[in-house]
Design a protein with these regions (language model features):
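Structural recognition of the beta-strand scaffold that forms the well-ordered cores
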Residues: 127-128, 183, 197, 265-268, ...
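Sec-exported extracytoplasmic/periplasmic mature domains
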Residues: 124-132, 159, 163, 167, ...
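Short pre-catalytic strand/loop immediately N-terminal to key active-site residues, enriched for Gly-Thr
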Residues: 227-238, 595, 642-643
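Solvent-exposed loop/turn segments at secondary-structure junctions
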Residues: 133-134, 191, 202-205, 271-275, ...
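Metal-dependent amide/peptide-bond hydrolase catalytic core
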Residues: 4, 22-24, 28-31, 36-61, ...
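Acidic/histidine-rich catalytic neighborhood of metal-dependent amide-processing enzymes
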Residues: 230-321
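Acidic/His- and Gly-rich active-site-bordering loop/insert found
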Residues: 48-50, 54, 58-60, 69-234, ...
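Loop/turn elements at helix/coil->beta-strand transitions in domains of secreted/extracellular proteins
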Residues: 192-195, 260-264, 294-297, 593-594, ...
Length: 673
């Protein structure tokens, strides 16, 4: 999009209009020639002072025609930009599916859900079993006793706590994959329907000993807090909330004598917090072996949650934001080796000093704040809450400009006059440039934390080196963690390193290698060796699952079930006492205000990274409460840190959601066309 003070010489390519500016004032768009200071204030640039008035008239006549054509090119709606920005209907940018009628799909069957107390106790008991897993743990065959001590008690608890699905007469079959991965299969009556998979994981992240005194309740107490309607402890959200609720949903359906047409699968890993290579990788391979590549209809795993009106990112609008993709991931290890010796005779830069230069270089050049076409789900999420009472005015206006640019780009009309007069003008290019500029302004309008969730990031997390204060460090290493935006790839990060560090290596006489690629070879003058290695699991972001068009059946079904399960006019489910054993009522149409739903991009990574061989219909959704947290502490801000907790309403609603999802998938198409 051409803006004020932007020249058109690159678009037109002729000197006579080289300094024409496009203006868009209240009276409408027009072209204005700028003045050449050397020629005087009243002479357009490109015309000699001796030009006749006739020449001037001809020039301005041409400019008038060009202005008319430009107005037709950009669109006559531009004159009403301010009005249009205020009147773009929200439903045009945030369409909503109707709530799915689960009651009708049940065909008279009554589901026997657990009581609120029983659901709370199940989550509490799960938290009390410590299933902590750290990084870089050896394989289950090498450390069999270690793995058994953690996960065998938990698997036994699951089997005891959900008796109906584990009964010998149950249609559900349980298998152990790679010893501790749990795979539950409930065969459907119609083998032509691809299975639906619900995922979760058993493991939790460690609790740092130095933080124990910061916990309101001990991290593995599973304390049921009646006052705040909360279950406290490590894993109460990530991921035992969803593990318990998915299993509870299947237990409910078995107990209620539900008969699935579509095969139902629970795939439960045991090292997601590490990288999933012992759990999810083996589970995925087993499912591909049984059902073939692309043999699964739909996967729902943990992921981005429901946001209450009080949660960050909602801007005051309750909304569900299931992720249709997740960012890629890459760890980089930087190792520097140099000559040691006594610190009384130091070189200009020690290995630690060189590492400091490299880190400073990286942090001085972060990845750009940009949005691409692959960011459409993230933009949709913002658009769906642009009427929120807490959204800043500048951000709302930036969103509206993106919407206008998207509309202009989707307008396929042409203007014949422009084709004749400006054959080199690329109308599509102008509209794409306008959209790029609008997206840039949108990123600039976001706060720093929000921008980090949408772009490729880097974080220097570990630096180690040196052994004694008077000894030159012979080696130092650092780890950098990257999360890769959907529009970028691992190769993008690799090129970023090469572009920054090759000149630095040449300047300071460093030998530089990246994996097996020698970027700057060593010489007799080399002062240190720098080795860069891609470390851990490398993971490119995948294309977002469709949320529009002919292949969006799975998304539409998921959205409809979410809107059936959560309503802003529904009160929270409460546990009045530890003797209160009431069963939550299933929604029978008494609640009308369904929650909004928007696709999003998962800012972190899940076990689904291993499941792309099975389906493109992968959704990452954190089924929780829609109500503000009574503790005053957002549960999303306490995952992986002190005071992790989940509301009692969350475990009740999550169980209802997964049961509703399985019932709906029994009746509706989710396969790709």
């Amino acid at each position: 999009m051409l803006t004020e003070h932007e020249t058109m010489d690159s678009l037109v390519g002729t000197r006579s209009v080289q300094h024409i500016m496009w203006r868009n004032d209240a009276v409408g768009p027009y072209l204005l020639p700028t003045m050449n200071k050397a020629s005087g204030p009243n002479v357009p640039l490109g015309l000699h002072p001796s030009s006749t008035s006739s020449s001037l008239s001809k020039v301005f006549a041409v400019l008038s025609v060009l202005a008319l054509c430009m107005w037709l090119l950009v669109g006559h709606r531009a004159a009403d930009t301010r009005l249009a920005l205020d009147t773009v209907p929200l439903q045009d940018v945030c369409p909503q599916e109707p709530a799915y009628n689960v009651t009708e799909a049940l065909e008279g069957l009554k589901l026997q859900f657990p009581s609120v107390l029983h659901s709370a106790k199940l989550l509490s008991e799960a938290v009390q079993i410590d299933t902590t897993v750290g990084d870089n743990i050896p394989d289950t065959d090498d450390w069999a006793e270690y793995w058994d001590s953690i996960f065998s008690p938990f698997a036994d608890w699951i089997q005891t706590s959900f008796p109906h699905m584990h009964d010998t007469a149950s249609p559900v079959r349980r298998e152990l994959v790679n010893k501790h991965g749990l795979l539950y299969t409930w065969p459907g009556s119609d083998p032509t329907l691809k299975p639906i998979v619900l995922m979760s994981h058993q493991d939790v992240v460690p609790v740092a000993n130095e933080t124990l005194d910061q916990w309101i309740h001990p991290p593995f107490s599973g304390h049921i807090d009646i006052e705040n309607q909360t279950v406290w402890g490590r894993g109460s959200v990530d991921c035992k909330l969803w593990l318990v609720s998915t299993i509870s949903a299947v237990e409910t359906l078995v107990k209620s004598d539900f008969k699935p047409k579509r095969t139902i699968i629970l795939s439960i890993g045991h090292d997601e917090e590490s990288d999933g290579k012992h759990g999810a990788q083996h589970l995925s391979a087993e499912l591909e072996k049984r059902f073939g590549r692309g043999g699964i209809g739909m996967i729902v795993d943990e992921g981005t949650p429901l946001l209450s009106s009080a949660d960050p990112g909602s801007y005051g609008v309750p909304i569900a934001v299931p992720a249709v993709a997740e960012r890629g991931a890459m760890n980089v290890k930087i190792t520097i080796t140099s000559r040691g010796g006594h610190s009384s005779m130091p070189p200009p830069h020690t290995s630690i000093g060189i590492m400091s230069l490299i880190i400073a270089k990286l942090e001085a050049h972060p990845f750009p704040d940009v949005l691409g076409d692959e960011s459409s789900a993230s933009i949709r999420q913002l658009q769906c809450v642009r009427d929120g009472p807490y959204m800043p005015y500048e951000l709302r206006q930036a969103l509206l400009k993106v919407e206008q640019a998207e509309r202009a780009l989707s307008d396929k009309g042409t203007t014949s006059c422009m084709h004749h007069m400006w054959p080199r003008m690329n109308r599509l290019h102008l509209k794409e440039a306008r959209l790029d500029e609008a997206r840039t302004q949108l990123m600039q309008a976001l706060d720093y934390a929000s921008r980090q969730l949408l772009k490729t990031t880097q974080a220097i997390d570990i630096v180690r080196g040196g052994i004694k204060v008077n000894a030159l460090p012979e080696s130092v290493f650092a780890y950098v963690n990257h999360r890769i935006a959907p529009y970028a790839k691992v190769s993008t990060v690799v090129q970023h390193y090469k572009g920054l560090l090759v000149p630095l290596a040449e300047q300071y006489r460093l030998a530089l290698s990246m994996d097996d690629d020698v970027l700057v070879p060593p010489t007799n003058a080399t002062t240190a060796n720098v080795q860069i290695e891609k470390s851990g699991l490398l993971y490119d972001s995948h294309e977002p699952s469709p949320f529009e068009g002919s292949n969006a059946d799975a998304w539409r079904l998921l959205s409809g079930v979410i809107r059936e399960t959560w309503h802003t006019d529904e009160p929270r489910h409460e546990l009045r006492s530890l003797d209160d054993d009431h069963v939550p009522k299933h929604n029978m149409g008494q609640y009308k205000d369904s929650v909004r739903v928007s696709p999003s991009i998962m800012f972190a990574n899940t076990d689904t990274r291993w499941y792309h061989n099975l389906t493109s219909n992968i959704f990452r959704f954190g089924a929780m409460t829609l109500h503000p947290d009574l503790t005053g502490m957002s549960p999303y801000l306490h995952i992986h840190t002190v005071n992790e907790h989940a509301s009692i309403d969350s475990i009740v609603k999550a169980t209802q959601f997964y049961a509703n999802m399985l019932v709906a998938a029994n009746h509706e198409p989710i396969e790709r066309v």
